[in-house]
Each structure stands twice: as C-alpha cells, then as structure tokens.
Amino acid sequence: MSATSATNFAVQTHPVKAPDEEYFFEGAEKLLELWFCSSTQNETRSLRIIPREEIDAMLDIARCKILHSKHNESIDSYVLSESSLFISDNRVILKTCGTTRLLAALPVIMQLAGAYAGLDQVQSVYYSRKNFLRPDLQPSLHKNFDAEVEYLDSFFVDGHAYCLGSLKQDRWYLYTFHREVEFPAHKQPDHTLEILMSDLDEEVLHKFTKDYAVDGNDCFMRAGIDKIIPAGADVHDELFDPCGYSMNAYMNDTDQYATIHVTPEKAFSFASFETNQDLVCLYSQTRKVLQCFRPNKILMTVFANDISEKGKDAQQQLWDRELPGYRRTNVQFVRLETETLVYAHFVRKASTGQDSSSSDEDDGERSD
C-alpha cells in the first residue's frame, strides 16, 4: 500500500521533498513469522492475551500503526498503516512495507511472548522479502540482506540464509531457524502461498485509487478481490487516500488467513497476496490472483510441511505447470528443517524476461 497524505493515525507520513525529487514508495514487504513454545511443561497461555497497548508500543518501534482489527476464536487480524499483523495462539506474522524497521520489533515480540503467554522460546523463524527497488532509502538495519542476517544471527544460533532467483532478475531472500524442542505442540498440516507481483496493468492500478472506489469495501467488490477470497471469509480492508489498498481476511473458526496489499503508482507498482487457507485449490486461487492484477512479473513461493497434502500439491503444480500467459524463467526446490519450499519466477510472454526494475542492491548473495 502507499499514501501521500496523513491523518492522525491512518497512514505513513512522508517528509516534504524538494520539487525535483520524485516521490517513491517501496511496496515490497518485509515478512516475519515466529512460532513460539515453552521450555518447560508449565501451563502456557495464548499470545492473543498480550494487551493492545503492548502491541501498539511494539508496532511503534517497527514504525507502523493499527488502523483496525477483527477477531475470531483462533486468530486476531490487524490491518496496519503499512501492511498486516496476525496473532494466533503460538504464532505471530508481521508484514510491513515502506521504510519500516520490522526487525527492530523482534526482541520486543519475544519479550511479550514470554512475559504474557509463558512462551519463552522461539521454535521457528521465517524472515523473507524480495529485493528492494530502492535499498538506499531503507533504514540501516534493512539496507541489505547481509545486515539483516547478522542481526537475526545475534538472536538465533545456526540460522540459515538463502537467496533464490537469478541475480539478473527479481530475487527473494529467506532466513530460517528451527529449534528442536522438548515439548513440541501437536503437528498440524501447514503451508503458505505467497505471490509477489510487480509492473501491474495500468487499468488495474486505477481501481485502487479514491478516484475509482469510495472505500475499502467498494474496492474489494469492484476490483475483483471478492473473486479471490474463499466464500464465507471475514474481511476487513482499507483504501488509502489518494491511492493504495490493504486487506486482511480470515476463514471462520480457524487461524487460516489471506492478505493483499497494493501499491498502485505506475512507476513502482507492486501487489502481494499471501494465504495459508486450505478451502480451495491453491493453484486455482493463484490463477484468480493473476487474472485480477495482471502483473508483468511474478515471484511465487509455496512452503509445505510433510503432512500438508494441499501444500505439496501446489508445489508440484508450480514445479510442473506453466501459468497461462506467463513464461517461467526460474524454479527452485529447497528442503528446509521442517518443510519444503518451491520458488518460481515468471514474466509475461510478451516481455523480454529481464527485470528492468531490479535494483542494484548488494544484498550479500549468500545461501546455506
């Protein structure tokens, strides 16, 4: 999402710029997913009992704000000024765009989990993002992947860092950590699909502006987002002024979620879709996402643990099949500590396949 004006709390503010300095907003998000557990058999509580004021203070450190929230019996969903936050019993997912300082909030999240829920150990960590268009505008902690890895390594021993994709195209960075624990939770099928889209169709971009839609709900229906999200999902969203869109959804009585964020300025257009739902086929849902946004470039990832049949099916289809209208330029398979990952990059068939928007980010092309 993006915005160039501010209210008391709703959007990121931007400093006044010299007349010859062009406006820019980094739509690509930083994504942190943390799974917690206890080091003892003492009674634990849900992360969802962390007080709202503590969550607000944590997000202040990351430089974003809560706009609104919704809840069911399994998950708390927050639409932020810069993307999204989801909290379930033992998992936190924080996704922030722009020039936020996401990793600066990490020690606070860990402290809150121990203090309020008795979850004093991080069992699994996933930090990921694509390459930035303007890494020079990021805070020092996020200017390059080497700096992010060094910071994460200060908390987690034996973490792993990866760079997936061609260095001549958009690429994707991942840091993972997993701790073998004495008292593991009951294992459930788990998978995550993420679609990162850039250079979107101009007709699509206009749909995510105040000139086209009145508010978030109007945008949800008129832009075709309603065709992507499974029927019956509970949705809350925000259409920013003058442009930009964020949406969270969760499936009733589960901790399954979906989130969409759109930066609709033509010079640096970007949209993301992420979900762990298992109600509909992930490959079919992917095709609906692409029909909605019509991007010229796509970066896709699918995580799946060994008991997620739907996740493994999506991985197989991503590995075996082309997406209609697109040419796959790269596909990679990675076996992680507790799951597998398939990464793929696509360009429209009319495109040359070279990412003219790809930055010169010196992100330490490291992989373990």
Swiss-Prot record:
Pathway: Amine and polyamine biosynthesis; S-adenosylmethioninamine biosynthesis; S-adenosylmethioninamine from S-adenosyl-L-methionine: step 1/1
Pfam families named among the record's database cross-references: SAM_decarbox (PF01536)
Modified residues (Pyruvic acid (Ser)): S83
Keywords from the named record: Autocatalytic cleavage, Decarboxylase, Lyase, Polyamine biosynthesis, Pyruvate, S-adenosyl-L-methionine, Schiff base, Spermidine biosynthesis, Zymogen
Modifications made to the protein after synthesis: Is synthesized initially as an inactive proenzyme. Formation of the active enzyme involves a self-maturation process in which the active site pyruvoyl group is generated from an internal serine residue via an autocatalytic post-translational modification. Two non-identical subunits are generated from the proenzyme in this reaction, and the pyruvate is formed at the N-terminus of the alpha chain, which is derived from the carboxyl end of the proenzyme.
Entry's EC annotation: 4.1.1.50
Cited PROSITE patterns: ADOMETDC
Deletion phenotype: Reduced body size as compared to wild-type with the production of fewer progeny. Reduced spermidine levels, but increased putrescine accumulation. Double knockout with the polyamine transporter catp-5 results in a reduced brood size, delayed postembryonic development, and a more marked reduction in spermidine levels and a more marked increase in putrescine accumulation as compared to the single mutants.
Catalytic residues as annotated in Swiss-Prot or TrEMBL: E26, E29, S83 (schiff-base intermediate with substrate), C97 (proton donor), S246 (proton acceptor), H261 (proton acceptor)
Single Gene Ontology MF annotation: adenosylmethionine decarboxylase activity
Catalytic activity reported: S-adenosyl-L-methionine + H(+) = S-adenosyl 3-(methylsulfanyl)propylamine + CO2
Keyword Protease: no
The record's free-text note on cofactor binding: Binds 1 pyruvoyl group covalently per subunit.
Enzyme class per UniProt: lyase
Record-level GO cellular component terms: cytosol
One GO BP annotation of this record: spermidine biosynthetic process
The UniProt record lists the keyword Metal-binding: no
Cofactor: pyruvate
Site location (Cleavage (non-hydrolytic)): E82, S83
Family: Belongs to the eukaryotic AdoMetDC family.
Function: Essential for biosynthesis of the polyamines spermidine and spermine. Polyamines are essential for cell proliferation and are implicated in cellular processes, ranging from DNA replication to apoptosis.
Subunit structure: Heterotetramer of two alpha and two beta chains.
This protein's name: S-adenosylmethionine decarboxylase proenzyme
Origin species: Caenorhabditis elegans
Gene this chain is encoded by: smd-1
